[in-house]
Swiss-Prot record:
PROSITE patterns: SAM_MT_TRMB
EC number from the UniProt entry: 2.1.1.33
Positions of S-adenosyl-L-methionine binding: 83, 108, 135, 158
GO molecular-function term, one example from the UniProt record: tRNA (guanine(46)-N7)-methyltransferase activity
Protein name as catalogued: tRNA (guanine-N(7)-)-methyltransferase
Biased composition (Basic and acidic residues): 1-11
Organism listed in the record: Corynebacterium glutamicum (strain ATCC 13032 / DSM 20300 / JCM 1318 / BCRC 11384 / CCUG 27702 / LMG 3730 / NBRC 12168 / NCIMB 10025 / NRRL B-2784 / 534)
């Protein structure tokens, strides 16, 4: 499936309307977003100035073209981790300096969130973070080759708490299969949620994907950084309501 007119009036803009959704040729469950539209937001003047200057270097928009990660980061052979739904990038910017040997790609729909992360990256002189604006499932499916990623992170995804909206949750059998395909053997999937019902939902799915071996939490021998370093905005709101943070780790089975 190709994306139609990809022209943009401004850097990093997405087409209006509903997000693009791939049709997968299997019987697994994938998020069906229905009436959800792209979130649009206004940047401050300073954010817009930085965006115009830095986006061509640091950012991309969802497209039907595989990313050449080595070329984008300017180095060969480094590990690559994709964070789905990076929000304002609080965890991203805190973790990246501690894993300087790893390429971090933050995927987010909300432009002001990416702009805030960009500000943290530029001010902190963090050189191992890049950004893609788009839906996480589509970005993974269209822009990363199978078996190319060392890690995938999904921190505090939208819980879609109403029963009729559960089908929109990103943690389902289909995405778990997609994550497994994109990970290298030995690659790690890390998920965190503070929503009790979503945690129960995930608990029912931890062994649904045969290519992912569930490691539980914590996993002391995990080959990647799992300490998120800071409390994100959404995590903080959950803690204020006495929510329990549930975390999950899987490793793609070795060949």
């Amino acid at each position: 499936m190709s994306i139609s007119d990809n022209s943009r009036d401004q850097l990093g803009e997405l087409p209006a309307g509903r997000p693009l959704q791939s049709d997968f040729d299997n019987d697994l469950d994938y998020p069906r977003l229905g009436s959800v539209t792209f979130r649009r937001g206004t940047l401050t003047e300073n954010q817009q100035t930085m965006w115009d200057e830095k986006w061509p270097e640091l950012g991309r928009v969802l497209e039907d073209e595989l990313i050449d990660v080595d070329a984008w980061f300017g180095r060969e052979g480094a590990k690559t981790i994709v964070e789905i739904g990076s929000g304002t990038g609080t965890s991203t910017a805190a973790m990246a300096p501690l894993e300087a040997d790893t390429n971090i790609v933050a995927v987010e729909l909300y432009k002001p969130g990416l702009a805030k992360l960009m500000g943290s990256v530029v001010r902190g002189e963090i050189d191992n973070v890049r950004m893609v604006r788009g839906d996480g499932i589509e970005v993974l499916n269209r822009m990363f080759a199978d078996g190319s990623l060392d890690g995938i992170r999904v921190y505090f995804p939208d819980p879609w708490p109403k029963a009729r909206h559960n089908k929109r949750r990103i943690i389902q059998s289909g995405p778990l299969n997609l994550f497994a395909k994109k990970l290298k053997p030995g690659g790690v999937l890390h998920v965190a949620t503070d929503h009790a019902d979503y945690a129960e939902w995930i608990n029912e799915l931890v062994e649904v994907e045969p290519l992912l071996e569930y490691k539980g939490w914590p996993w002391e021998e995990c080959p990647q950084l799992t300490d998120r370093q800071v409390i994100t905005k959404f995590e903080g709101k959950g803690l204020e309501k006495d929510h329990v943070i549930n975390e999950y780790l899987w490793q793609k089975v070795q060949n």
